[in-house]
Amino acid sequence: MWNGTLTEEELRRRVAAVAGDQTDELLTAYRNAMPQGRPADRLIAALTGSNFWVRTVLLAERYVARRRAPVYMYSLDWQSPAHDGRVRAHHAMDLPFVFDNTDMPDTTAGAPDARELAARISATWIAFARNGSPDNRAIPSWPTYAAADRATMVFDTHCRVVHDPDHEARLLWSRAVAPTG
């Protein structure tokens, strides 16, 4: 898949296996979001969307509904230069940042901006562990997650709060993977 040999037909087949009736709309959404992306790039984005991102969103919604504790949502959008930039921000990519250990060549390639981001993210996790709130001077004010605005901290070269990121994909994936019954 990394070598770019995935065809549009194979992309469709693999997305259909997880998206069902939402396949056409999701493929269009990913094509629009990644116009220069190869089929392999769009497949990785789609599988990330279905296997990790939207399920995290659905879980956050359940916790918000319980009203027992504040919920905070984040997205790591920083793109690693490792492996010619093909690694992207993948599952568990946040761990080197949380532990302020970004010198690993296979994940962050020791990039200078990775070190800066690690200082911000590790300060954020420390603040959360100490106070129950991630707010600290290293990042913008981080509001709690709520269904009304879906405030999400985006960790990247420039950290920022985005409301309901990837709205269209969230709605499509929510319908495709939501539990029934």
What is each of the regions a protein language model found here?
Residues M1-D113, T124, N131:
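Substrate-gating cap/lid region and adjacent catalytic-acid/histidine neighborhood
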Residues R66-R67, A89, A119, Y145-A147:
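Extracellular/periplasmic catalytic domains that process cell-envelope and extracellular macromolecules
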Residues S75, Q79, N131-H158:
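Polar, surface-exposed loop/tail segments
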Residues F97-T107, A148-C159:
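Short helix/strand-capping connector loops at secondary-structure junctions
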Residues A114-I139:
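Non-catalytic, well-ordered alpha-helical segments in soluble enzyme domains
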Residues H158-G181:
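Tryptophan-rich aromatic "cage" segments
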